[in-house]
């Protein structure tokens, strides 16, 4: 039961931070949250937990907020801003990948006690980040594209571009 409560708290906290970031900093706040979420999701993806009667990675919650971010940006700032958030997430993950792999090249001090743990955690990073970034890029760019297709369809069909927000959000993200 504790895992379920922690996941619910995590979702509320992470989504709340995305909304707070947008309220305080506008697009820049969402770009920042997107970058942090993609980096941390790749680390959290190493952790498997049992919650809600299924095994899952913790990275799922952080990756989920990136869909909220692109939907907010699509709705309020436009398609270009939403795609920029996707590219920001990719760039930040590539930056993290290169930097974290460079750590493995250093010769640690004889007094170091952390390097074995760092190597254990980050030895899978390149493969995981490459795989997750490929899926992230495809799914996010498709989500943004489909969001705007739904938007054009509902505007053409009903003559109001602000109606059917629920359809744009729910019709693009699950696919």
Question: Which residues does each predicted region cover?
Answer:
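Membrane-embedded alpha-helical bundles of multi-pass transporters/translocases
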Residues: 127, 131, 135, 166-167
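Membrane-interface interhelical connector segments
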Residues: 103-127
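Internal alpha-helical transmembrane segments of multi-pass membrane proteins
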Residues: 155-174
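Hydrophobic transmembrane alpha-helices
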Residues: 1-73, 80
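Transmembrane alpha-helix boundary signature
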Residues: 44-53, 76, 98-111
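Helix-boundary and loop/linker segments of multi-pass membrane transporters
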Residues: 24, 117-123, 155-159
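Small-residue-rich segments of transmembrane alpha-helices in multi-pass membrane proteins
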Residues: 34-46, 89-101, 170-173
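Transmembrane alpha-helix/helix-exit interface in multi-pass inner-membrane proteins
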Residues: 87, 91-110, 136, 140, ...
